Regions:
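Hydrophobic ligand-binding cavity/cleft-lining segments
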Residues: 1-131
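Actinobacteria-biased recognition of intrinsically disordered, low-complexity terminal regions
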Residues: 1-7, 252-267
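Beta-strand/loop substructures that line and gate deep hydrophobic ligand-binding cavities in soluble
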Residues: 97-216
C-alpha cells in the first residue's frame, strides 16, 4: 500500500452562486422540448438525441443517441442511452447512462443529486465492461456538498469528497478535504491510497515501496495542473450571472462521452 499526499489552493465558488447555478442547469433541461419524433428541441447540440420511451424528464424516460466513427462502416459506432430514474426537484434527480462500444465493450454510469434546490450530495458510479478481465474497471465517487460547505466555513469532520477506482488487480482511493484559505480561496488536501488486490497485493506492496516517490511527484504535478486550470477558468465564470453561465447539458454529455471513448480505446 502507498499513501500519497498533495495540496492545492484554488479559487472559491460562493455557495449561493453554486446553488443558483445548479437550479439553472435543471431549469434549462426542463425547458427543452421534443418534436413528434421524440427529437430534442431547444439545443442544437442535442438535436441528435431522441426520446424513445416514456415522458420527457420523468422517471422511466429513455433517450438514445447513435454515432458513427469518422471512418469505417455505418453502424460501427456507439449507442448511448440515458434512463431517467428520478426527477423530483424537491427530493432527488438521478439517471443511468449506458454506452455500447464496438468490440462488445460497454460503459455504464449512474448519477444522483439529492435535494436539488439546495444540493445535499452528488453520487456517481460506473463500470467499464470488456471481454478481458484486465480491461475491466469500476468506480464510485461521492461529493457531500453540505459537508464541503461546513469545512470551508471552518468546520471539521470527514472528507467531503471520496473517489474509489477498482481494477481486478488493484484499487485506488482518493480523499479530498477542504478549508478556507482567505482571500476568496480554498485550500484542498488530497490523500490517495493505492494498493494491490488478490494475489497481486503482496507483489504490489513491494513494488510500491520503490515507486512511491515517483507516484507522489506525478500526483502533485497533476493536481497543480488541474488547480492552475481551475484558477484560470473560475474567475471568468463567476463574472456571469449563474443562470447565464456555464456548462450546460450538452457540455456535460460531451465530457462524459470523451471519457467513455478513452475507456473503450484503452480497453
Amino acid at each position: 500500500m502507498a499513501r500519497l499526499q498533495a495540496a492545492a489552493v484554488v479559487e472559491a465558488i460562493p455557495r449561493d452562486w453554486f446553488e443558483e447555478y445548479v437550479r439553472a442547469l435543471l431549469d434549462r433541461a426542463e425547458d427543452l422540448r421534443t418534436d413528434e419524433e421524440g427529437r430534442i428541441q431547444g439545443d442544437e447540440e442535442l438535436a441528435d438525441v431522441a426520446l424513445v420511451e416514456g415522458d420527457h424528464l420523468t422517471a422511466g424516460a429513455r433517450y438514445q443517441r447513435h454515432t458513427d466513427p469518422p471512418e469505417g462502416e455505418d453502424g460501427n459506432g456507439t449507442t448511448s442511452e440515458l434512463l431517467i430514474t428520478s426527477w423530483e426537484r424537491t427530493r432527488e434527480v438521478s439517471a443511468a447512462v449506458t454506452t455500447w462500444h464496438p468490440d462488445d465493450q460497454k460503459t455504464t454510469w449512474t448519477v444522483k443529486l439529492s435535494d436539488p434546490g439546495a444540493p445535499g450530495s452528488l453520487v456517481a458510479g460506473g463500470e467499464h465492461h470488456a471481454a478481458k478481465r484486465l480491461h475491466r474497471l469500476s468506480w464510485a465517487a461521492r461529493l457531500d456538498i453540505r459537508q464541503w460547505w461546513r469545512q470551508v466555513e471552518g468546520g471539521g469532520g470527514q472528507a467531503p469528497v471520496t473517489v474509489l477506482l477498482r481494477h481486478h488487480y488493484g484499487q485506488a482511493r482518493l480523499l479530498v478535504r477542504a478549508a478556507a484559505e482567505g482571500g476568496g480561496k480554498w485550500r484542498l488536501g488530497l490523500t490517495l491510497v493505492v494498493r494491490g488486490r488478490g494475489w497481486v497485493r503482496p507483489l504490489a506492496a513491494v513494488g510500491l515501496l520503490f515507486v512511491r516517490s515517483k507516484l507522489e511527484a506525478e500526483l502533485r504535478e497533476a493536481v497543480a495542473e488541474i488547480a492552475e486550470n481551475w484558477n484560470a477558468d473560475i474567475p471568468e465564470l463567476l463574472k456571469h450571472d449563474p443562470r447565464d453561465a456555464g456548462i450546460w447539458v450538452s457540455d456535460l454529455r460531451r465530457d462524459r462521452e470523451e471519457l467513455d471513448r478513452w475507456l473503450a480505446e484503452n480497453g
